[in-house]
């Protein structure tokens, strides 16, 4: 690139001669330098030199003379857009616009040009020397590092973001230099908070990058210089989109530090004196930092360990910084708390931690959801907080798990986590069981009435039939009316179910198997009613289909009995998995071989059969004798081969007997021998594979029945049947009484002995002010009003808060951890033991 300079034509005749050298950056490396010639520039001493806009702009040529024999010299060329020189004729000064370069005097140091590429290259290589002249350049050109010409045009990346992405051994010396330059050009806040502007990384700032690079020094430096700790990175890469690469962390710097397991940065962001982060801040979908931690959980052991640890630390730190803030009760835009979000996404490890969290520190004990009532050896009686769990609250954990999609991972296993397992059992034992058995009895009575009404239907004439004044007709009409009323009940119940649950097509036949069958039963019955009053005898066909489905739906009520319920689940799974696949392959074989056989058969070759000039291949085309020249009859005959009742010589009306026999033998081998035996093998494998899964599915089905029964109650009735008891378990941070709706569960833990973990009663088993045997304690798996009468935990709290925690005694034998609920038969071990609490 050639550099040019313009020189004032009205200069003095004897200007000083000076030697100038070209800036090496302005010389083309591929061009050859011609022999230097002596030259002289006439420049005014009072001329001010300023930098121009770009090297690419066209410049006016400079005037120079070359004298042979003088020493060769190269001019130093700098950019100037305005040259001011004194002119006696024009007044005090005369200003002239220059397009490219001006020539400095020998007393001034030449300045270097900078563009985006040169700055990016310098910061990427951690080269501070190349940026020595950046500040004078910006000051003289009145530009800032945040100007558009210094940003990546596609992503909006600045030189600070470029430097953050190019750390050398965890540091880049140009970062502090760039921040100092931005401070001196009055653009520090804008510069340090500049973010990506493209749709993929939109919103990511230097602070996000420093946290992602796990660099505490840079995080501190950025926050000290005014970095926004609430900046949200909401580009496509930071959203949770299925099938697309990315990492969702909650958009905010605090959430990023938490989701990448950086507790030191989390504490710094919350406790720094420059700009503390808001612990309750939400992202674009309403998630707080606790929601973000739940989102990044993946149910692996290492991940669950760090997520639960970070969750606990943030919860405790938030309670200390903001004592009155109920961080765990904040909901996102879907109305989910972190607990409900863990349930809806199948994060069973995080769910179990939140439900069973017990914090022994007195100042943070109000964060506990589990309180140890008493402990005796391995036996623990625990009180579980039912807030956000029971169905009395919106988006409760029980409803979220029971009514979630079948694609939710660990859906069946989550109901086995305490206190959910015991809570559902308590509801079933106290009231749902009786209501369910009553409904079962009513349905059996309904089906008997429906069957009798269908069996004794009139057969003479066309419907509707007139009622005769006989006792039998009165009973028949009454049965028909009751049957139709039941059909309307199942129809509207199905409509209500589909409107409330809105199951997807993919999960419709998995989660809504029974509901679909009841709904189809009602449709057949109502269609039969319409045909009956339309004077059509075809009403009988719809009625018998409804009758058959009605008795089949009796399997729905087997979920009230464990063994029959598990058996019904296995039948359902085999129908939906093995039998559906078998039927698809079998129908393909049946249709294919039927079309081949029916094409081969010709009835006209048999004189006993009437000759038909035009063959109709349909179910209605039958001669006086058996004719297999139709697809319908041939399919029926081939079906007999499937069940082993076929005859290879069921007809003689065909040509090419060898071909006919080969077709039949191939069909028998593929269906009767191969497909049927494969179906039997698959069913046996399915039974072995889903034995335990079927039990969990049965528990889920029973849980859905329990919740449906509760939802059918009025609000006043729900409160009357609510499990647990309202108790004062301590004090809130502001000194008020802390009341919780608690549910008691007796557990056995062979690794944690009688240690002071929170609230422990001195007299184990003495929760009512009266003595009770250990066997009763073991059998009492639920909380009733009688158990909780005149019982409060406030005295225990006051006593526990004044004592220091005792260190756990070393165990003599290291046993494998076991945590579960005591069964009634376990009490036999303690038959001869002294009653706890007695002297």
Curated annotation (Swiss-Prot):
Non-selective calcium permeant cation channel involved in detection of noxious chemical and thermal stimuli. Seems to mediate proton influx and may be involved in intracellular acidosis in nociceptive neurons. Involved in mediation of inflammatory pain and hyperalgesia. Sensitized by a phosphatidylinositol second messenger system activated by receptor tyrosine kinases, which involves PKC isozymes and PCL. Activation by vanilloids, like capsaicin, and temperatures higher than 42 degrees Celsius. CDD domains: TRPV1 (cd22196). Residues 456-472, 533-535, 599-630, 653-656 are extracellular. The chain crosses the membrane at residues 434-455, 473-497, 511-532, 536-556, 560-598, 657-683. Homotetramer. Interacts with PIRT. May also form a heteromeric channel with TRPV3. Interacts with CALM, PRKCM and CSK. Interacts with PRKCG and NTRK1, probably by forming a trimeric complex. Interacts with the Scolopendra mutilans RhTx toxin. Interacts with TMEM100. Interacts with PACS2. Channel activity is activated via the interaction with PIRT and phosphatidylinositol 4,5-bisphosphate (PIP2). Both PIRT and PIP2 are required to activate channel activity. The channel is sensitized by ATP binding. Repeated stimulation with capsaicin gives rise to progressively smaller responses, due to desensitization. This desensitization is triggered by the influx of calcium ions and is inhibited by elevated ATP levels. Ca(2+) and CALM displace ATP from its binding site and trigger a conformation change that leads to a closed, desensitized channel. Phosphorylation by PKA reverses capsaicin-induced dephosphorylation at multiple sites, probably including Ser-118 as a major phosphorylation site. Phosphorylation by CAMKII seems to regulate binding to vanilloids. Phosphorylated and modulated by PRKCE, PRKCM and probably PRKCZ. Dephosphorylation by calcineurin seems to lead to receptor desensitization and phosphorylation by CAMKII recovers activity. It catalyses: Ca(2+)(in) = Ca(2+)(out); Mg(2+)(in) = Mg(2+)(out); Na(+)(in) = Na(+)(out); K(+)(in) = K(+)(out). Resiniferatoxin binds at residues 513-514, 552, 559. Na(+) 1 binds at residue 644. Residues 778-793 are annotated as: Required for PIP2-mediated channel inhibition. GO terms for cellular component: dendritic spine membrane; GABA-ergic synapse; membrane; plasma membrane; postsynaptic membrane. Residues 685-713 are annotated as: AD. The modification Phosphothreonine is found at residues 146, 372, 705. GO terms for molecular function: ATP binding; calcium channel activity; calmodulin binding; excitatory extracellular ligand-gated monoatomic ion channel activity; extracellular ligand-gated monoatomic ion channel activity; intracellularly gated calcium channel activity; metal ion binding; phosphatidylinositol binding. ATP binds at residues 117, 157, 162, 166, 201-204, 212-213. Responses evoked by low pH and heat, and capsaicin can be antagonized by capsazepine. Residues 1-13 have a biased composition (Basic and acidic residues). Residues 631-652 dip into the membrane without crossing it. Residues 768-802 are annotated as: Interaction with calmodulin. One of its GO terms (biological process) is detection of temperature stimulus involved in thermoception. The modification Phosphoserine is found at residues 118, 504, 775, 801, 821. Glycans are attached at residue 606. This is Transient receptor potential cation channel subfamily V member 1. Pfam families: Ank (PF00023), Ank_2 (PF12796), Ion_trans (PF00520).
């Amino acid at each position: 690139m050639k550099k040019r300079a313009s020189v004032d034509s009205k200069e003095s005749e004897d200007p000083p001669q000076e030697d100038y050298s070209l800036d090496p950056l302005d010389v083309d490396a591929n061009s050859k330098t011609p022999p230097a010639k002596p030259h002289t520039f006439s420049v005014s001493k009072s001329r001010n030199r300023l930098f121009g806009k770009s090297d690419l702009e066209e410049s006016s040529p400079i005037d120079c003379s070359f004298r042979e024999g003088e020493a060769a010299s190269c001019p130093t060329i700098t950019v100037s857009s305005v040259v001011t020189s004194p002119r006696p004729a024009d007044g005090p000064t005369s200003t002239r616009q220059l397009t490219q370069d001006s020539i400095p005097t020998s007393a001034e140091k030449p300045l270097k040009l900078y563009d985006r590429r040169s700055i990016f290259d310098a910061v990427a290589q951690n080269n501070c020397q190349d940026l020595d002249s950046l500040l004078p350049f910006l000051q003289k050109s009145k530009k800032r590092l945040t100007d558009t010409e210094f940003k990546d045009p596609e992503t909006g990346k600045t030189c600070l973001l470029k430097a953050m992405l190019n750390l050398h051994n965890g540091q880049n010396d140009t970062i502090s230099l760039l921040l100092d330059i931005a401070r001196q050009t009055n653009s520090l806040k804008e510069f340090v908070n500049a973010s990506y502007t493209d749709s993929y990384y939109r919103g990511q700032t230097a602070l996000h990058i420093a946290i992602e690079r796990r660099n505490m020094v840079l995080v501190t430096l950025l926050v000290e210089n005014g970095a926004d700790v609430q900046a949200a990175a909401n580009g496509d890469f930071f959203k949770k989109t299925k099938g697309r690469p990315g990492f969702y962390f909650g958009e905010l710097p605090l959430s990023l530090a938490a989701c990448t397991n950086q507790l030191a940065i989390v504490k710094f962001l919350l406790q720094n004196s420059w700009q503390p982060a808001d612990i309750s801040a939400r992202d674009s979908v309403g998630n707080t930092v606790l929601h973000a931690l739940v989102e990044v959980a993946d149910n692996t052991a290492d991940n669950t360990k760090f997520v639960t640890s970070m969750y606990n630390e943030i919860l405790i730190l938030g309670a200390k910084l903001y004592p009155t803030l109920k961080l765990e009760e904040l909901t996102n835009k879907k109305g989910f708390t972190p607990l409900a979000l863990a349930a809806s996404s199948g994060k069973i490890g995080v769910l179990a931690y939140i439900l069973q969290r017990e914090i022994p520190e007195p100042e943070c004990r109000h964060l506990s959801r589990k309180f140890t009532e008493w402990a005796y050896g391995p036996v623990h009686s625990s009180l579980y907080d039912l807030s956000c769990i029971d169905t009395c609250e919106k988006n409760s954990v029980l409803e979220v798990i029971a009514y979630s999609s079948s694609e939710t991972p660990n859906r069946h296993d989550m109901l086995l986590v305490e206190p959910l397992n015991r809570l559902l059992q308590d509801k079933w034992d106290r009231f749902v069981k009786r209501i369910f058995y009553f409904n079962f009895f009513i349905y059996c009575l309904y089906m008997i009435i429906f069957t009798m009404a269908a069996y004794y239907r009139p057969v003479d004439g066309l419907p509707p039939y007139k009622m005769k004044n006989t006792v039998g007709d009165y009973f028949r009409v009454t049965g028909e009316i009751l049957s139709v009323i039941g059909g309307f009940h199942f129809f509207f119940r199905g409509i209500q179910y589909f409107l409330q649950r809105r199951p997807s097509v993919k999960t419709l036949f998995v989660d809504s198997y029974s509901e679909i069958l009841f709904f189809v039963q009602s449709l057949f019955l109502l269609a039969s009613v319409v045909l009956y009053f339309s004077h059509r005898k075809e009403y009988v066909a719809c009625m018998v289909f409804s009758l058959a489905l009605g008795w089949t739906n009796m399997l729905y009520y087997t979920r009230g009995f464990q063994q029959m319920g598990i058996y019904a689940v296995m039948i359902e799974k085999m129908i939906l998995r093995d039998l559906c696949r078998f039927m698809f392959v079998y129908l393909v074989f049946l249709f294919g071989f039927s079309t081949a056989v029916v094409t081969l058969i010709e009835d006209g070759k048999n004189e006993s059969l009437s000759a038909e000039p035009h063959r109709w291949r349909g179910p209605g085309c039958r001669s006086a004798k058996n004719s297999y020249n139709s697809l319908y009859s041939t399919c029926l005959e081939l079906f007999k081969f499937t069940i082993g009742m076929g005859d290879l010589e069921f007809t003689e009306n065909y040509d090419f007997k060898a071909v006919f026999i080969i077709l039949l033998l191939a069909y028998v081998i593929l269906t009767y021998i191969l497909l049927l035996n494969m179906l039997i093998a698959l069913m046996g494998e399915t039974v072995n594979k889903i034995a335990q899964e079927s039990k969990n599915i049965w528990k889920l089905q029973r849980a859905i029945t329990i919740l449906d029964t509760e939802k059918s109650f009025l609000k006043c009735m729900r409160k009357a049947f609510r499990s647990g008891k309202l108790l004062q378990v301590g004090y809130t941070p502001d000194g008020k009484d802390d009341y919780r709706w608690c549910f008691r569960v007796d557990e056995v833990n062979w690794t944690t002995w009688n240690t002071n973990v929170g609230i422990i009663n001195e007299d184990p088993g003495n929760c009512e002010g009266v003595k009770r045997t250990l066997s009763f304690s073991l059998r009492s798996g639920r909380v009733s009003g009688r158990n909780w009468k005149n019982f409060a935990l406030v005295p225990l709290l006051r006593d526990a808060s004044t004592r220091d925690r005792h260190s756990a005694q070393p165990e003599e034998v290291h046993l494998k951890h076991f945590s579960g609920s005591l069964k009634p038969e376990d009490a036999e071990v303690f038959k001869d033991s002294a009653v706890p609490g007695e002297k």
